[in-house]
């Protein structure tokens, strides 16, 4: 990191599958549109629009951004003297935090001046980050707990049939369950590809036709598998 605090506005028109890794600094994300999946250990948390999630230094995690997702990220260097939260979890995005992030997004990140107005905003965000109260007691604060088991099934590649679960999950993701299921298939395909599998091998391991993978690749990944 060039500065002690840095801001990035991420735009993902297509599925983005991050690798599992330990964070080299503390950071938080706030989803503006779409949804980000955060894997911590065996659990995967859904960060929907308007929701924030904090990840501390040295935290093993993986991020997946669904197609059409925009989110803000603020990174805090280990050089920062301000104490920050040492636990991962959801946090409440206050109107002030939302306004500060929106203000930062009006200017390209590479044009931000540490000694200018952007630097002052980032320092205010650092103060707010020091006060965050986080929790991982829920898989998604936007989804009623009775639907969490269905959400877990989908994220693990299974299908759901209960209408109430389908309606609740679709309202949070703002896309159909079938679209979400297709994204999960392609996420696993990407992971297998990264481990050296060829398309035919991936299709066999996922028990799907190779033609289906080819059909899903362009609209979901923006490129062939």
Identify what each model region corresponds to.
Residues 1-35:
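Generic protein-terminus/edge-of-domain signal
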Residues 32-33, 48-49, 67:
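A cytosolic small-molecule/anion-sensing beta-strand core signal
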Residues 33-39, 52-53, 61:
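Short beta-strand segments in beta-sandwich/barrel cores
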Residues 41-57:
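Short acidic-glycine-tyrosine-enriched beta hairpin
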Residues 59-90:
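Ligand-binding loop in jelly-roll beta-barrel domains
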Residues 93-166:
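An amphipathic alpha-helical interaction segment
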Residues 152-181, 191-225:
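Basic/polar phosphate-binding segments, predominantly the helix-turn-helix DNA-binding elements
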Residues 184-188:
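Pre-recognition alpha-helix immediately N-terminal to the DNA-recognition helix
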